[in-house]
Amino acid sequence: MASVLLTRRLACSFRHNHRLLVPGWRHISQAAAKVDVEFDYDGPLMKTEVPGPRSRELMKQLNIIQNAEAVHFFCNYEESRGNYLVDVDGNRMLDLYSQISSIPIGYSHPALVKLVQQPQNVSTFINRPALGILPPENFVEKLRESLLSVAPKGMSQLITMACGSCSNENAFKTIFMWYRSKERGQSAFSKEELETCMINQAPGCPDYSILSFMGAFHGRTMGCLATTHSKAIHKIDIPSFDWPIAPFPRLKYPLEEFVKENQQEEARCLEEVEDLIVKYRKKKKTVAGIIVEPIQSEGGDNHASDDFFRKLRDISRKHGCAFLVDEVQTGGGSTGKFWAHEHWGLDDPADVMTFSKKMMTGGFFHKEEFRPNAPYRIFNTWLGDPSKNLLLAEVINIIKREDLLSNAAHAGKVLLTGLLDLQARYPQFISRVRGRGTFCSFDTPDESIRNKLISIARNKGVMLGGCGDKSIRFRPTLVFRDHHAHLFLNIFSDILADFK
């Protein structure tokens, strides 16, 4: 399929690269690379098992005041640098998960440290304003230097938020207001609308819906949770909305061996999208918008072809639905383009696009026609954080200056090639290797083996993340280089060789 042609090309070239199959073959040593010792370490250093004794003690203390069962270990961020995360027991790990894909240019980047230390920036970091009513003098300037400098095609409007969930939540509200405005025309709010909205009834609160996909993750607030379908524990016991849920393609790998089957699978899913839009219109729960991730991340790193997304965009236009692309995890450069949807090759890729994580702040871009028609309709106290815009402007400068998008593409190719090698040698443990840039993943036989591999890797000095039922995902920073990929591949090759 077109969405991950790189995987196909690498798989084909791999078949001719027999040296990768030679027993004892090693990826080139990380020692051959030039390491900036002021920013990056030269490799992992493990002193205890993870979590170590200090982490376990702190976990006990935290568990007294909140459920701390999700905590992996406690970190020493003062000592963490570049691609390496250091814990409170002194263990230094190559971090290929980067705080759930949210660290853009590594830990404690010197340029960001310098920025924070500059006297003229002190007030920005200590005075957090209510941006909707009292923004600082340089607010527009910093937005232009940061977010607006990477605005996606066709979207000139921008609203900042604090996180991915509130970005999607407010994007939903924006879509609903846009849709109702289309229906209302130039008329003002009616007296009935103003009264019924206060008691959560129509017509003031119209019964619109957002179509989402099975396997999606869009956040944990009430509206977002209605479009999140990745893990039951995220949703259980919480009331939700009757909104349509379409199947997302489940592609078969290797892609070049299942072209016809995958095309049929995508066609089936697109047909179901259209059927659901029609069905919910008849139910008087009109689909006002469609939300989709360019790569379903939390749900298992599920890919679809570029053609699938182009056709999905066409469906949204045909039925008058807003098209919302959730780039919270895929945005920021890890796929080799700043926004993953750029791979689709569309001049009009979306009506609304949300972001967070690597972007340092949350928020969403949107077209002019989605602009709220009155103040306080999309609003909260902080509406983001100017200090994050300041940091992001420097992050974007570094991405451009160091050509980190090209780096993500190249280092990702090294990583993906190595994973295909490991898949060929250890098919009993690794399958469905896939990825775009460094945004890579593979499947394991089951959840138990997946979790065991992640745990062993952590104790060998490598941080990995899980997703879906049995997948391992890679979310390194943009300063993840070829030699970091080789280092990981050597360590993980040894793990697989000894795995029982």
UniProtKB/Swiss-Prot annotation:
EC category: transferase
Name of the molecule in the record: 4-aminobutyrate aminotransferase, mitochondrial
Record-linked CDD domains: OAT_like (cd00610)
Note on cofactor: Binds 1 [2Fe-2S] cluster per homodimer.
NCBIfam families in the record: GABAtrns_euk (TIGR00699)
Quaternary structure and interacting proteins, as annotated: Homodimer; disulfide-linked.
EC number(s) per entry: 2.6.1.19, 2.6.1.22
Originating species: Sus scrofa (Pig)
N6-(pyridoxal phosphate)lysine PTM positions: K357
SUPFAM superfamilies cross-referenced by the UniProt entry: PLP-dependent transferases (SSF53383)
Amino-acid positions noted as binding [2Fe-2S] cluster in the UniProt annotation, renumbered to this chain: C163, C166
Subcellular location: Mitochondrion matrix
